[in-house]
């Protein structure tokens, strides 16, 4: 990644496209920041991310973008990385592929140990984020709601580094100790991020935040003779340096000099807690807590780490009781910065709920003697703390809630006209008494213009039964559900686009993230049933799935028009009216989104492939992922990336077995 240029501008957007439709007006208004909190109400397919990128370019502020799940965060990261190739666009999500938190269920008397699977690449990207924030100003961080969980303090992360200077003398044993204190691990066989090895007078270090280079340190006696960046695959020297600041290998660093102080405060808290249990006559809880804590203290003293070390974070960071943990937003406190909350109608409620969920789980662990009360101080931010850290914020949503509108003091910027000038789809309401037979007729009519169909139902049973029925009527149909892996999901969507399927049936997977321009009909079964899957926002999101095609239509099957249906239909019609007026005034003709189908047939080798075939498939998919990104087809790029991850897991699992 290149460093920023000496140009006065920090951020440089690179794109072959210029803002169109509603984008120029939205960019100009958002960049004014008439209020510190604003809403970008952008209809599906209007290019909201491109608008935000242009705002970043205009305001020239370090930025955090938060999405409500990893998939959307990955899509935003890929897109912004392409748009800002010379800036530090970083990815900050939870590094757990699987996470079962520690818990105690008093009603059952069951203790559940923490269990987790760490994704090393995501872990590296998190360290890369902190490294960039500690060393650069031109940083855009794309994260999930996990961003409100604790991380290393800015002061500590910046402090723990190693300056390497050509000509300076280093004792190799001392250098090894310094690397270990930065959480680097010796590995003589294979260098991966966070590892180092000694080979005579040469030390090779793979920085914990790097991907495309290894640091080679060549010594003559005790003197550092050369610092070189080398290619980790070819060992080719990329460049030589006079000096280098090596950052930590890991996100969390324990200050060895102050460790004794932390151990003393943990012991003091343990002593007080044991007295508390004694007063209440709970000897079993006291004994349990003493055993667990003393074991952890021994490990901390010996290794600087222990199982569940995060529960002692407040002591290790020397924070006062009940204080706010350090988090990613603390790296942005030195000046103005921008926060973008993507899909704010979902992201803000998630942020609100995480604090109380964490407190509730830990209260039982503390009450029954599994953890000290200070464990509560390692927690996500409360919503109030999250709000306190905000500088400037843009809430982005096709369906913002009343809260975001109030927070922005009604400063809502609408972006309804698409770059393709497509209209929001026409919405038709039909009785649901004959919905299945009517759907069959509609799917057959779709064949006239080679259109595809999405159908959303309320239950798994309904989805399975409907899929079976449609198959009996010779409809090429598939059922897409939550248990389908990314690779299989990608195959289904690609086959739908190719025409191998003409219809996909699903439940709640059809609201966000499915971008299939061939879909010209979305059918919503039981649209009048009250509840979250059929509220106004959900219905508008579902309607948006048909907004990529010039023939886009939505059929709501319902015997009555519910209040939520009425609101969604009226909002869709309001948008259609604005879009039609714009097209008429500017003489624009709507065009179906053009999106190449790049995925080739060999992907169907899948899990039954030989290892050689899988390796070839990974190579092919990597090429297609890059091509999709180059074409700005970011949703497909993310789907392919997730498929590569799955294949790599299968590949590694086969090797280990």
From Swiss-Prot:
This is UvrABC system protein B. Residues 615-650 form the UVR domain. Residues 435-597 form the Helicase C-terminal domain. It comes from Mycoplasma pneumoniae (strain ATCC 29342 / M129 / Subtype 1). The UvrABC repair system catalyzes the recognition and processing of DNA lesions. A damage recognition complex composed of 2 UvrA and 2 UvrB subunits scans DNA for abnormalities. Upon binding of the UvrA(2)B(2) complex to a putative damaged site, the DNA wraps around one UvrB monomer. DNA wrap is dependent on ATP binding by UvrB and probably causes local melting of the DNA helix, facilitating insertion of UvrB beta-hairpin between the DNA strands. Then UvrB probes one DNA strand for the presence of a lesion. The beta-hairpin motif is involved in DNA binding. ATP binds at residues 42-49. SUPFAM superfamilies: C-terminal UvrC-binding domain of UvrB (SSF46600), P-loop containing nucleoside triphosphate hydrolases (SSF52540). PROSITE patterns: HELICASE_ATP_BIND_1, HELICASE_CTER, UVR. NCBIfam families: PRK05298.1, uvrb. Keywords: ATP-binding, Cytoplasm, DNA damage, DNA excision, DNA repair, Excision nuclease, Nucleotide-binding, SOS response. One of its GO terms (molecular function) is ATP hydrolysis activity. Pfam families: Helicase_C, ResIII, UVR, UvrB, UvrB_inter. One of its GO terms (cellular component) is cytoplasm. Belongs to the UvrB family. It comes from the Bacteria. Residues 29-416 form the Helicase ATP-binding domain. Forms a heterotetramer with UvrA during the search for lesions. Interacts with UvrC in an incision complex. GO terms for biological process: nucleotide-excision repair; SOS response. A motif (Beta-hairpin) lies at residues 95-118. It is found in: Cytoplasm.
């Amino acid at each position: 990644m290149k460093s920023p240029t000496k140009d006065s501008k920090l951020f440089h957007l690179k794109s072959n496209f210029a803002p169109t439709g509603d984008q120029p007006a939205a960019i100009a208004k958002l960049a004014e920041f008439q209020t510190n909190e604003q809403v970008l109400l952008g209809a599906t397919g209007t290019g909201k991310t491109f608008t935000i990128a242009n705002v970043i370019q205009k305001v020239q502020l370090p930025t955090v973008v938060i999405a409500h799940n990893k998939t959307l965060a990955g899509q935003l990261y890929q897109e912004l990385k392409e748009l800002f190739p010379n800036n530090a666009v970083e990815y900050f999500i939870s590094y757990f592929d699987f996470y079962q938190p520690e818990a105690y269920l008093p009603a059952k008397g069951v203790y559940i140990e923490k269990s987790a699977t760490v994704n090393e690449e995501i872990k590296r990207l998190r360290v890369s984020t902190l490294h960039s924030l500690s060393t650069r100003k031109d940083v855009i961080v794309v994260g999930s709601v996990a961003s409100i969980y604790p991380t290393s303090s800015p002061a500590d992360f910046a402090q723990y580094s190693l300056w390497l200077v050509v000509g300076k003398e280093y004792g190799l044993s001392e250098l090894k100790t310094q690397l270990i204190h930065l959480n680097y691990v010796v590995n003589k066989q294979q260098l991966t991020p966070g590892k180092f090895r000694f080979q005579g007078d040469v030390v090779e270090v793979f920085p914990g935040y790097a991907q495309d280079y290894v640091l080679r340190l060549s010594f003559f006696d005790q003197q550092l003779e050369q610092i070189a960046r080398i290619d980790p695959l070819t060992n080719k020297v990329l460049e030589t340096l006079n000096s280098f600041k090596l950052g930590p290998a890991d996100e969390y660093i324990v200050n060895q000099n102050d460790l004794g102080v932390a151990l003393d405060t943990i012991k003091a808290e343990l002593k007080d807690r044991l007295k508390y249990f004694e007063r209440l006559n709970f000897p079993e809880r006291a004994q349990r807590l003493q055993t667990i804590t003393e074991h952890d203290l021994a490990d901390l003293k010996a290794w600087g780490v222990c199982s569940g070390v995060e529960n002692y974070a407040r002591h290790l960071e020397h924070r006062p009781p009940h204080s706010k943990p350090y988090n990613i937003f603390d790296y942005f406190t030195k000046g103005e910065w921008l926060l973008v909350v993507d899909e704010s109608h979902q992201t803000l409620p998630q942020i609100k709920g995480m604090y109380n969920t964490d407190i509730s789980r830990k209260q039982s662990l503390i009450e029954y003697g599994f953890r000290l009360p200070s464990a509560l101080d390692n927690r996500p931010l409360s919503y109030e703390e999250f709000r306190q850290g905000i500088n400037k914020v843009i809430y982005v949503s096709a369906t913002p809630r009343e809260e975001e509108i109030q927070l922005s003091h009604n400063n809502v910027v609408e972006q309804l006209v698409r770059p393709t000038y497509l209209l929001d789809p026409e919405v038709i309401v039909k009785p649901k008494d004959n919905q299945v037979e009517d759907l069959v007729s509609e799917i057959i009519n779709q064949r006239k213009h080679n259109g595809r169909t999405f159908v959303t139902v309320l239950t798994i049973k309904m989805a399975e039964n409907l899929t079976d029925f449609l198959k009996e009527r010779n409809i090429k149909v598939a059922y897409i559900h939550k248990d389908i892996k990314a690779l299989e999901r990608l195959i289904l969507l690609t086959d739908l686009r190719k025409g191998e399927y003409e219809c996909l049936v699903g439940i709640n997977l059809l609201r966000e993230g499915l971008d299939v321009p061939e879909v010209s009909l979305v059918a919503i079964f039981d649209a009048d049933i009250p509840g979250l899957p059929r509220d106004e926002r959900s219905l508008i999101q579902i309607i948006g799935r048909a907004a990529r095609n010039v023939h886009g239509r939505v059929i709501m099957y319902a015997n009555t028009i519910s209040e939520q249906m009425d609101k969604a239909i009226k909002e869709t019609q309001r948008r259609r009216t604005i879009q039609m007026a714009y097209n008429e005034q500017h003489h624009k003709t709507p065009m179906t989104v053009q999106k190449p189908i790049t995925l080739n047939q060999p992907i169907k080798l899948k899990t039954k492939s030989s290892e050689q075939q899988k390796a070839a498939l990974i190579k092919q998919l990597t090429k297609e992922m890059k091509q999709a990104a180059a074409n700005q087809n970011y949703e497909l790029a993310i789907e392919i990336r997730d498929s590569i991850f799955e294949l790599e897991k299968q590949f590694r699992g086969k090797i280990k077995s």
